[in-house]
Amino acid sequence: MTTIMKTSGIWVCLLLALPQFSEGQQYLNAGEVDVAIVRNPFMASESILAEGLVDSLTALGATIGKNETFSLTEEEEAYSGWAREALVSRHIADLISANGRNEYLTVALLGSCSDLPGVLSGLQNMGPGQEEQVYHLAANIPNRVGLIYFDAHADVNTPETTLSGMYGGMDVALAAGLYNDNNRLITGLDPPLPPSYILLADVRDTDPREVELIERMQFEIISTDDIRTQSENVHAQMKRLSELTDVIYIHIDMDVLAPEEVSGHGLTAPDGPTSQELADCLELIFQYPKAAAIGIASTPYGPRDPDHLSRQAAVRLVQGALRGVNKRT
C-alpha cells in the first residue's frame, strides 16, 4: 500500500470519527440550554449583566454554566492600540476554547467589534465535548467557523481602503486574512476564514474602496428586508453555512439597529431593524443546530443610554437567540 493510500485511509477514519449531531443535541441537558457567558471586562458588558441578562435567560429555561471574564497581565497592560486589541482577543479566545463544542451556547459580551477575532479563534479551537467520541488526532483539526456579521458597516476595510482608519472597521478583513496576519495569529485564529464562510447582514454604510473589496471577495449578503421578513434568503444562507461549516458565530454590532434604540452609539445608520425585528430573526437563525454563539458589541451604556433602551435591546437579542435554541427538536 502506498504512503498516499495509507494517509488517505487515516483521514477517512478521522472524518468518520467526527460526531454527526442530531438537531437537538447541542447545549441541551434535560430539556435546558446550558449557556456560557464570556465577557470583555468593559463597562458595556457589565451594564448588560446589570440589565438582568442572567435572570432573563434563566426565565427562558437556560442554565448559566459559566460566567467568566479576564484581566490583562501587567506586561500586556503596557501595550496600546492594535497590539492591545489582539491581546484582549486572545484572552476571549482562551475562555471560549476551554469549552467543549457541544456543551454550551456561548454568549459573548464584547467591548467593540475589535473583539471579533477572539470569538472566532475560540470557536475554531474549541475541543470535542464530553459526549463526542473522536480519535485523539482528530481533536486537533480546527473547527470550520461560519460568521454572520450584523453591522451597519461591513468592516471589510484594510489600511489601503479605509477612510476613517478605525481598527474596528477592519475586523472582518482581518478575520478573512486580508491584512495584519500578525495580529490574527496572536489571537489564535489560524487559518483565516474563507470568504464563503462569511455572511454580511444589514450593511448600510460602506467606504467606496471597501465596496470594491466586498465585490471582489464575493461576500454573501442579507438585507434589512430579509431580516424583517425572515425571508427565504435567510433560510438559504443558514442552510449554505450549515453545510460548509462546523459552527456558526452570530456577531452583532448594536449600530445595526434602528438609531432610535442606539442613539448613543455614534456610528448609527438610518433604516435599521428594531431590536424586536432582529430578535425574531435570531430566533429563526438559532433554530439551526450549527448556530453556536452570539456576540453583542458596542452597546451604549451610562449617560449614552439614559433610558436603558440600548441595554434592554441587547438583552432582547440574546433572548431571541435562546428562544431559537429552545425550538430545536
Q: Where are these predicted regions, by residue range?
A:
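Conserved alpha-helical scaffold segments that buttress catalytic/binding sites
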Residues: 26-329
